[in-house]
From Swiss-Prot:
GO terms for biological process: cell differentiation. Residues 165-224 bind DNA. This is Hematopoietically-expressed homeobox protein HHEX homolog. One of its GO terms (molecular function) is RNA polymerase II cis-regulatory region sequence-specific DNA binding. One of its GO terms (cellular component) is nucleus. The gene is hhex. Residues 1-35, 221-280 are annotated as: Disordered. Residues 232-252 have a biased composition (Basic and acidic residues). Transcription factor that may play a central role in activating or maintaining gene expression in the vegetal pole. Part of a gene regulatory circuit with Erg and Tgif that operates early in mesoderm development. It is found in: Nucleus. It comes from the Eukaryota. Its main location: nucleus. It comes from Patiria miniata (Bat star). Keywords: Developmental protein, DNA-binding, Homeobox, Nucleus, Transcription, Transcription regulation.
């Protein structure tokens, strides 16, 4: 007994192909939908319906999607090169000289840079070269002899003499004190030419040398007075000598400056000669 076979619904592709007007009126395939490819190499519905060339390119078509993937895997586009900035000639020369030098030009020879005029002008250049700073600081007697101008920051500190104490008393260095003591051992009084020569040698003023010798003579007399007596007449003469020297300091210096003989009228010629021998 044979079974009855009822024909089923036709496939959608055949329905679309045989009923183009239905698709046109009901809008099953719109312009934005992907076309249904027909079997056996039949062209798409839109091509048959419109009777024109290939449809316009839209991002929703399969061919366009596949084509975009192929383009992505293809050769990359050359990256555009940005144009190099151009500078004036003086800026290029400064740029080249900066990299040719091993040391920054600002450290070797600082030059003032002008930024404009008025309130925004460049600050004044450095007072003097860096190599002259140690000489100006170490030199105790003439700190400005080796530099062209005075510094603007340390002016109140360097201008004050370094060997002066707060109370005005002079402080001599060890070398200066040794030279003065050595000279005092051989000569208790100095003539003006000798005082000038010694002051120049020790880099002191003549007034400082004169004051030092006066103080040293006063100390020397005080020490001799404190020595215990026990030798008779010699000790008595030693007691009288400091009083005579105190009176005749100024007159003796005048006599030495004129080159005359050392003669005093206080106690006679013999006493003056004995004083000179003991002082020597």
């Amino acid at each position: 007994m044979s079974t009855l076979q009822y024909p089923g619904p036709p496939p959608p592709s055949s329905m679309n192909l045989h009923n183009p007007h239905m698709n046109h009126h009901h809008g099953l395939v719109g312009p934005g939908l992907a076309p249904l490819s027909a079997p056996n190499g039949i062209q798409s519905l839109n091509t048959l319906h419109n009777g024109s060339g290939p449809p316009s390119h839209t991002p929703f078509y399969i061919d366009n999607i596949l084509g975009s993937r192929l383009n992505m895997t293809g050769p990359a586009r050359p990256t555009p090169t940005l144009p190099s900035p151009t500078f004036p000639a003086h800026m290029n020369s400064a740029y080249n000289s900066y990299y040719e030098q091993a040391v920054h030009p600002g450290l070797a020879a600082p030059t003032p840079i002008s930024y404009g005029s008025g309130a925004f002008s460049s600050p004044p250049p450095y007072p003097f070269a860096r190599g002259d700073y140690p000489h100006g600081l170490i030199d105790r007697h003439d700190p400005y002899s080796k530099v062209p101008g005075k510094p603007f920051l340390w002016n109140p500190f360097i201008q004050r003499p370094l060997h002066k104490r707060k109370g005005g008393q002079v402080r001599f260095s060890n070398d200066q004190t040794m030279e003065l003591e050595k000279k005092f051992e051989s000569q208790k009084y100095l003539s003006p030419p000798e005082r000038k020569k010694l002051a120049k040698l020790l880099q002191l003023s003549e007034r400082q040398v004169k004051t030092w010798f006066q103080n040293r003579r006063a100390k020397w007399r005080r020490v001799k007075q404190e020595v215990p007596t026990g030798k008779g007449e010699g000790d008595e003469n030693s007691h009288e000598k400091p009083r005579d020297l105190d009176r005749d300091d100024f007159s003796r210096e005048q006599v030495l400056s004129n080159g005359a003989a050392c003669a005093f009228t206080h106690g006679g010629g013999s006493e003056a000669d004995s004083l000179e021998e003991k002082e020597a």
